[in-house]
């Protein structure tokens, strides 16, 4: 997550989607042991929750998916271009080209959040800004994210594979999609 999982060590070039499921598995091992859990995910987290619930159905009591409905279908012919794009984006990140924007203060972060989501109230944006960013050594507020998350995956999304995993979900599931579009 943002801000609470920073580790010292070498930078990561990119992330592989199954790593997120393995991270979730480790978190559940640590915090829930053998107990079943209620799992809620939003957007990419909803995709992770759905995949995890199908791969480890015995661990999930209830599943809530908020706007995590997979990705567009891909075709094998897209693979060469996708791998080239992935390699190019890794080089860009290594040169600092995908660095996350810095802000003069927490208010700037809050304004950025409200611009992205006009329905977000100022008090909620201020609260999020304090948890989503922190000041660096120069006093600028940096988003607590890893630019490597912005890299396009080299792997193509396989809808048939995802559907086969979804078929294994045994927990009662609730899926929700927003009715408004603020973009």
Q: What are the residue ranges of the model-derived segments?
A:
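Active-site loop/turn elements of alpha/beta-hydrolase fold enzymes
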Residues: 1, 7, 68, 178-180
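Active-site loop/oxyanion-hole signature of alpha/beta-hydrolase fold enzymes
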Residues: 1-40
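Alpha-helical elements of Rossmann-like donor-binding domains used by nucleotide-donor carbohydrate transfer enzymes
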Residues: 19-27, 51, 108, 112, ...
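Conserved hydrolase catalytic core segment
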Residues: 34-80
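A catalytic-pocket lid/entrance helix-loop region that shapes and gates access to the active site
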Residues: 66-101
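Helix-loop "lid/cap" segments that line or gate small-molecule binding pockets
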Residues: 94-99, 108-120, 131-133, 150-154
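Conserved serine/cysteine hydrolase catalytic core
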Residues: 133-183
């Amino acid at each position: 997550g943002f801000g609470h999982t920073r580790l010292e060590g070498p930078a990561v070039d990119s992330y592989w989607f199954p790593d997120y499921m393995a991270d979730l598995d480790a978190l559940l091992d640590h915090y829930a042991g053998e107990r079943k859990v209620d799992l809620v995910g939003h957007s990419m987290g909803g995709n992770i929750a759905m995949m995890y619930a199908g791969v480890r159905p015995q661990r999930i009591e209830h599943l809530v998916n908020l706007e995590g409905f997979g990705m567009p279908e891909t075709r094998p012919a897209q693979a060469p271009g996708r791998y080239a794009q992935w390699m190019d984006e890794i080089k860009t990140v290594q040169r600092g080209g995908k660095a996350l924007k810095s802000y003069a203060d927490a208010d700037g972060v809050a304004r950025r959040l409200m611009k992205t989501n006009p329905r977000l109230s100022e008090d909620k944006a201020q609260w999020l800004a304090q948890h989503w960013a922190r000041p660096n050594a120069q006093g600028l507020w940096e988003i607590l994210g890893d630019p490597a998350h912005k890299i396009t995956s080299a792997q193509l999304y396989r809808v048939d594979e995802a559907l086969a995993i979804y078929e294994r979900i045994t927990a009662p599931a609730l899926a929700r999609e927003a009715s408004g579009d603020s973009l």
